[in-house]
């Protein structure tokens, strides 16, 4: 079983170069459902480098921060490293609402003890203000998150409904 798992992880990691943002989004969406999904997402994003596009760097940061949840040691280091990846991506593209969504979702789900919650209102505003200028595919992804999020009010959720 371990051999099959290792082989699976190898192929996932190897195929990252050919992966689309849509495939990464799907993996990110299910990563929070289980430890195994988180580990798969973390492995998938390991090939992302500082030379990749900012959105991939943001997802890499998210994978590191999510992986910290299951780490026995180095939790602080993983959280710090993940945050650096996300913030660096946002510094490169501050108006990218998908990067804003990644940061918002992390801040929404991290325990209150982790000091990474101060940008939620700012990110919500950028997401809501720019929602209709995005592609239909990205709008659907954003809408799915917003409808399930506790950070958005019922009025804000209505605002982006079809």
Describe every region a protein language model picked out:
Residues 31-32, 66-75, 109-114:
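Short coil/turn linking the two alpha-helices of tandem helical-hairpin repeats
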Residues 18-42, 48, 57-59:
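N-terminal leader/linker segments that initiate helical-solenoid repeat arrays
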Residues 30-44, 75-83, 116-117:
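Helix-turn-helix repeat elements of alpha-solenoid scaffolds
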Residues 127-162:
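Terminal, low-structured helical/coil segments at or just beyond the last alpha-helical repeat
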Residues 1-22:
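Bacterial Sec-dependent N-terminal signal peptides
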């Amino acid at each position: 079983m371990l051999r099959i798992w290792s082989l699976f992880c190898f192929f996932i990691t190897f195929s990252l170069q050919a992966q689309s943002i849509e495939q990464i989004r799907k993996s990110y969406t299910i990563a929070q459902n289980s430890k195994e999904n988180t580990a798969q997402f973390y492995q998938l994003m390991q090939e992302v480098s500082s030379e990749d596009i900012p959105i991939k760097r943001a997802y890499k940061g998210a994978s590191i921060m999510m992986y910290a949840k299951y780490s026995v040691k180095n939790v602080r280091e993983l959280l710090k490293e993940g945050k650096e990846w996300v913030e660096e991506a946002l510094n490169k593209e501050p108006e990218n609402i998908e990067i804003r969504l990644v940061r918002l979702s992390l801040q929404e789900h991290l325990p209150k003890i982790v000091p990474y919650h101060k940008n939620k209102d700012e990110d919500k505003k950028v997401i809501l203000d720019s929602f209709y200028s995005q592609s239909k595919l990205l709008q659907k992804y954003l809408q799915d998150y917003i409808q399930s999020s506790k950070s958005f009010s019922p009025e804000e959720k209505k605002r982006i409904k079809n």
